[in-house]
Amino acid sequence: MSKEPSSVALVTGANRGIGFEVCRQLASRGFVVLVTARDEAKAKTAARKLANAGAVEPVLLDVADPSSIKNAQSEIATKYGLLDVLVNNAGINYDTWETAENADIGGVMETITTNLLGPWRLCQAFLPLLRKSKAARIVNVSSESGSLAHMGVGPPAYQVTKAALNALTRTLAGELRHAHILVNAVCPGWVATDMGGAGAPRSVEEGAAGVVWAATLPQNGLTGGFFRDGKPLPW
């Protein structure tokens, strides 16, 4: 009997922090994990560090560059023919000390390009490959900062783009429900990463676990939701 092929997962922003740990956890579960970064050397370094966890492969991918997305999609389509899991993890937060009133619009546009249009373009590019999977999953790494129920004063471009990412999640989940592709947003919580800072209360392992949970939901699993640690959050 031939061995069932391993499921293929792509993780953006995977060279450090939550993305790196998501790759480690997925690889340890038997996935072939495509470790992406916008710097090819960093993707290769991350893949080397993850080699003991399982099957990993570095892929050059800049979510803010449409040509980079196209090249990565072509490479993956040629080598694997499908994609089972897409984790949109890459994101930026450059406006921590700004307000909506005085925000630099150039920085806002950069944040929109990475945090919203990046995942949107990735979904558009990889949906043909995800449709070939028997159990495809899309996980958008969001933040409670993007919850309208909890939103207040905070980094304006970051939280507005995360709210928009949540809206994209709901839209895609509705469109893809009958295609058996589950689409969810996950808040990893305040995690001790380069972005979250050393004083954050949650470990990278804890933050990544909720993302991996959504990436490995069963066929009849939830879709169109916003979760932390597998529990619903308000939009």
Give, region by region, the residue ranges found by the protein language model:
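Canonical Rossmann dinucleotide-binding motif of NAD(H)/NADP(H)-dependent dehydrogenases/reductases
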Residues: S2-L34
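Rossmann-fold scaffold of SDR-type NAD(P)-dependent oxidoreductases
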Residues: T12, L83-G91, N115, N140, ...
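The beta1-alpha1 cofactor-binding region of Rossmann-like NAD(H)/NADP(H)-dependent oxidoreductases
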Residues: E40-A41, L60-S74
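A glycine-rich helix->loop->beta "capping" turn
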Residues: A53-A55, E75-N88, Y94-T96, L182
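Conserved residues in the N-terminal Rossmann fold of short-chain dehydrogenase/reductase
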Residues: V59-L60, T113
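Catalytic loop of short-chain dehydrogenase/reductase
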Residues: I92-I112, L117-Q124, R131-H178
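C-terminal helical subdomain
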Residues: H178, A185-P188, G197-W235
